[in-house]
A protein has these predicted regions:
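Conserved GNAT acetyl-CoA-binding A-motif
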Residues: 61-78, 234-250
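Aromatic (often tryptophan-rich) hydrophobic motifs at membrane interfaces
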Residues: 177-272
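ATP/Mg2+-dependent ligation/transfer catalytic cores
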Residues: 27, 34-55
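A short, internal acetyl-CoA/4′-phosphopantetheine-binding micro-motif in the GNAT/acyltransferase core
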Residues: 45-61, 209-221
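A conserved beta-strand-loop-helix scaffold within acyl/acetyltransferase catalytic domains
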Residues: 1-39, 84, 88-96, 110-218
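Well-ordered, non-membrane alpha-helical segments in soluble/globular domains
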Residues: 54-66, 82, 116-120, 164-165, ...
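Conserved active-site alpha-helix within GNAT-family acetyltransferase domains
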Residues: 72-95, 248-268
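Conserved alpha/beta-domain cores
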Residues: 97-105
Length: 272
């Protein structure tokens, strides 16, 4: 709801909410549409009016629907989460061109091997002992975070995004939904991943949207270190709160994601 309200203000969207209640008044689920044409934010109309200028991951759609109910979603989508698979009657996961997302493995039993965790911790220790520093992004201002992200994105990819003001507005309005760490080396930022966080009663979703790092510091593997720090911190937070971790790397677009993640299927909703 906070994201939807933010986007309504930013892009003057006309959202409409559909909510289902049990006979006793208990909330069972709901979803939001953009002007009665498509599911809000993830549809084509939202894309046309500039939603991609804001740093939101739109690779998976989890609808807030009680798993015990069955319902129809009269709008098309190809990114329905497996969480909703049993609840949405008009959905299919076998006829969706094998679409998947990459979800980070757990840092506990059944996740990363002891060898992998030891290697990541050694890399982190080497970085810290050589003049590196780790700073929680919450200690930096929205302007500082936007400047760091844009600078490191350009150093990694060779192009500089032009959405600074949108980033500042987003971070300012949704401060509690931004997560992760910034790496500094000799006082200069060298790695940062833009990650959003959304809390639910049974899980916490983390979306790694994009990031950048200073290629001149490749000897320390800053991209690997910041990834490890963020995934580990997310796991520890979920353990403390007794919730499932859903840490998304998005679509399987690069080989490195399979080293960090397991794949989960995405479904599509069929026309009714």
């Amino acid at each position: 709801p906070d994201v939807l309200n933010f986007m309504q203000r930013q892009l003057n969207l006309r959202h409409k909410y559909y909510v289902m209640h049990a006979p006793n008044g208990a909330l069972l689920g709901g979803f939001c549409t953009n002007a009665n044409k498509e599911i809000a934010i993830v549809g084509r109309a939202s894309k046309k009016i500039g939603i991609d200028s804001f740093m939101f991951n739109k690779d998976e759609m989890i609808l807030p629907i009680n798993r015990r109910i069955k319902t129809l979603i009269p709008y098309r989508s190809k990114i329905l989460s497996s969480i909703n698979g049993h609840s949405v009657i008009n959905s299919t996961f076998s006829l969706n061109s094998q679409r998947e997302i990459c979800l980070a493995k757990t840092c506990g039993k059944g996740g990363y091997s002891s060898s992998t965790k030891n290697s990541r911790n050694r890399e982190l220790k080497k970085f810290l002992n050589s003049g590196g520093d780790v700073v929680d992004q919450a200690l930096l201002t929205p302007n500082q975070l936007a400047d760091i992200y844009l600078e490191l994105f350009e150093r990694r990819w060779g192009v500089k995004p032009d959405n600074k003001q949108q980033m500042v507005d987003m971070i300012t309005s949704l401060r509690d939904m931004i997560f992760g760490y910034v790496l500094f080396y000799n006082g200069q930022p060298c790695a940062f991943q833009f990650i959003t966080r959304a809390d639910s009663p049974k899980w916490i979703c983390f979306d790694y949207v994009n990031g950048g790092y200073d290629r001149e510091q490749d000897g320390f593997c800053p991209g690997t270190i910041v990834t490890w720090l963020n995934v580990r911190a997310a796991y520890e937070l979920c353990e403390r709160e007794g919730k499932e971790m859903r840490y998304s790397f998005g679509k399987p677009t690069a080989p490195y994601k399979d080293r960090w993640c397991e794949r989960a299927p995405l479904g599509r909703t069929l026309a009714v």
